[in-house]
Structures are given as C-alpha cells and as structure tokens.
Amino acid sequence: MMKGNRLINGKETIRMRILQIEKNTIGNILSDLLKRSPNHYGAYEGAVQEIIEAVREKGDEALFAYTEKFDGAQLTAETVEVTEEEIKAAYEQVEEELLAVIRKSMNNIRIYHEKQKQYSWFDTTEKGTMLGQKVTALGSVGVYVPGGKAAYPSSVLMNIVPAKVAGVKNICMVTPPGKDGTVTPTTLVAAKEAGADHIYKIGGAQAVAALAYGTASIPKVDKIVGPGNIYVALAKKAVYGHVSIDSIAGPSEVLVLADETANPRYVAADLLSQAEHDELASAILVTTSMEVAKAVEKEIEGFVKVLSRKEIIQKSLD
C-alpha cells in the first residue's frame, strides 16, 4: 500500500494508495519505496546552525525569542522551568486509569534496563597486575521529548527510566510548550513518575543548543537523548562532539505485515500512530489480502475524522 489523498463530494479525504505487486513489478515498486523519504537535511541545516549559534552566543535572550517565534509562548527565566504547582495541577487532570498505565509501563521499562546495566569489576593476575573496568554514570543528561499539541509519555519513560537505572544524578527534560506556555498534563505526570529532576518548557533546535552549551536558565548536560523532528535531529548532529548524543533519529516509519486474519481497525491504528508523528513519517502496509487492504483504508478515513493531528497525518500520507 502506498499513500495519497482524494476528493469526495468536494471534500478532501485521506486514502492509502493500494499497489498490487506481481513478480514482474516487484523490483520497481520496492525501488520506489526505498526512495519514498529522501534526505532533506540540506534544506534545513542552515537554519538549524543559525539557531544554534544564536543560542550559544546570546543564551536566554535567543532561547526565549525562538520559543516565542516557533511555539508562540512568551517565557522568561522565572517561568521556563515547570513548577511543583504545575505538576500538582497536571496530576489532577490525569485519570487514575491512565496513571496506572504509566506506572505499569515504567516498571516494565525499569525491569528491562536493569538487566542491561553494566557493573564495575576488577581482577588481579598471578603477577599482581590489576585488570578491570570502572563503570561510572554520567553526571547529567538532557532528555528531549516532543510536545506542543501532542503528548508522548512513552518517550518520557523510555528515556528517563534508563537514565535513572544507570544512576545519572541530574536529569533535565525539555519539551515544547503550547502557546499558553504550558506542557500537556500527561507529559508532566510521566516525567514526575519517571524521576526527572528538572523540566523546561523549551523545544526545537534551540532547546538542543541550550542543553549543549548551557544558558543562564538551562544547565549544560553531558549527553542529549530523545526523539524529535528534523530540526532536533540536525541540532543533535551539529552539537555532537561538544556533547554526547544517543543517535540522529530520522522520521518515524512503520511497516505492518498482515494476512486475511488481521483486524483492519488495529492495522489502521498502528499505521496512524506513526503517521501522526511527523510530516515526513512513512506508514506502509504489506498484506496478502486485498479485502484487508481496502478495509484498512476505510478505517483510516474514519480515524482521521476525529484525530486532532489531522493535518500532519495528511502530509505524511500524501
């Protein structure tokens, strides 16, 4: 299945373009799929570098100016960090059922990473030579969590919990604010539960620069982790070497394999869960059943009508 939009009764609706693969066409189709999301880095690198240099030279002044420009939020040194009062208010807005899910997920993630944890060890040879390794946790880590209109508690948990397990002393989370200068309650609750030491209402390349070089309000960290859009990815690439990073993550992708027994609604939900992340995201279904393909297409149209990130989904599926 490929992607595209169509008009019905004068209204644009999202559809997945369905391609039936035969032996004589599989080569060309697979080649096209590999080209579906070309490297667009060159178009953004100049702007990202400009932001980084401005924050590096002007600190908070540039940081808050870019936050207002890109996120529409007016912040100061006094309001950039999330307060305990804001976190308390967030808990009041999160349902108990969701809080239970966050805690269960957090526990599962912790158990997994505790099994990965490395330990120091030392040994002495017969001749008295000491061999070994000393494992020391980083002093500080900056966790980037996408935000704005959407909430990504999974990104919060999957980045903060491993840092806590490793023994990082200072975990600073950054996430873009809404226009009103607030962070989504679910994100705040997940951060508090996971153990973030500080939460700052900043995002984009300017947040990465602030974490890498430090400002009057944002402390410099030893490592920056977490996903983000192309600006965040390029910013992490640019500051790598001055500060450690986890990786340069590209746009979200998902490939779902399904036969005739698959539930079309579940398949559609899996595809859209990635398509809503980024305009450059790719969502692909490979199925042996034409009936399933058409049913998934119909489910996607139904889902999109009620999803708040409709515009992003439309662009990612275009």
Q: PLM features: residue spans?
A:
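NAD(P)-dependent aldehyde/semialdehyde dehydrogenase
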Residues: I284-D318
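Short, Lys/Arg-enriched N-terminal segments with co-localized hydrophobic residues
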Residues: M1-R15
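Conserved small-residue-rich beta-alpha loop and adjacent elements
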Residues: D123-V189
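N-terminal Rossmann-like NAD(P)+-binding subdomain of aldehyde/semialdehyde dehydrogenases
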Residues: T13-G139
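Short, solvent-exposed amphipathic alpha-helical segments in soluble enzyme
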Residues: M158-I160, L188-A190, A216, Y240-H242, ...
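Conserved NAD(P)+-binding/catalytic subdomain of aldehyde/semialdehyde dehydrogenases
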Residues: G195-S282
